[in-house]
Amino acid sequence: MRTIDLNCDFGESFGVYRLGQEEILSYVTSVNIACGFHAGDPLVMRRTVQLAIQHGVAIGAHPGFPDLFGFGRRAMAVSPEEVYAYVVYQIGALAAFVKAEGGVMTHVKPHGALYNMAAKDAALAEAIAKAVHDVDPMLVLYGLSGSELIRAGRACGLRTASEVFADRTYQADGSLTPRSDPRAIIADEDEAVTQVLMMIRDRRVRSVQGTDVAIEADTVCLHGDNEQAVRFAKRLYQALQNEGIAIQAPRREERR
């Protein structure tokens, strides 16, 4: 039976600023928790880990650039050495909360500009993969399907999960359409569900240029920061079940 993971970025509040709907945890199988650089703070991280454990969803670190004002979505001129340190630091911070709450960390997914840059920059991708491997080689590395990050993870022996997006359009080279392009976001729920089913069943996606692009889909990213997102997550969850597609998170590699 074909299986798919549904993941969402979570714990992206900071101080009195609140972002995210807890209800979405009923319809996802893994969460990527902000680690304090682009969003999140120690109290938010602890509470988010507790929520994830209560709902039985897989817990992952969501490291980003140190850019609270830009929410980690602004590109930064950084070296691979800096990226390595950023990722190790953030995984370590979240891992401490996960351990304190009696949970298990399963994966790592970079955030925002770091994710997008590592999709195309082999040196940054290798730095991220090495950081994950050095902290815990049993962690699963999430990255854009067909990206340098997925290649780097596989090259260093990590298990990887190729990620696709329900509400984003694609370019002919398999990259995401930049948010600056008015065609970047899929607002129509029917269109988004159709795209997800095509990516899972047919292993392809229709680009904005009109060409079909081959794609691997191990995990689908959903956004959980508004009421509409919760409704869509429920709808997609039901559509996958109706198609006989099992919904489950990738498992950590067993220690040998």
From Swiss-Prot:
GO terms for biological process: carbohydrate metabolic process. The keyword ATP-binding applies. The keyword NAD does not apply. Signal peptide: none annotated. Keywords: ATP-binding, Hydrolase, Nucleotide-binding. Disulfide bonds: none annotated. Its EC number is 3.5.2.9. It catalyses: 5-oxo-L-proline + ATP + 2 H2O = L-glutamate + ADP + phosphate + H(+). SUPFAM superfamilies: Glycoside hydrolase/deacetylase. CDD domains: LamB_YcsF_like (cd10787). It is an enzyme of class 3 (hydrolase). Catalyzes the cleavage of 5-oxoproline to form L-glutamate coupled to the hydrolysis of ATP to ADP and inorganic phosphate. Forms a complex composed of PxpA, PxpB and PxpC. Belongs to the LamB/PxpA family. This is 5-oxoprolinase subunit A. It comes from Geobacillus kaustophilus (strain HTA426). The lineage of its organism: Bacteria, Bacillati, Bacillota, Bacilli, Bacillales.
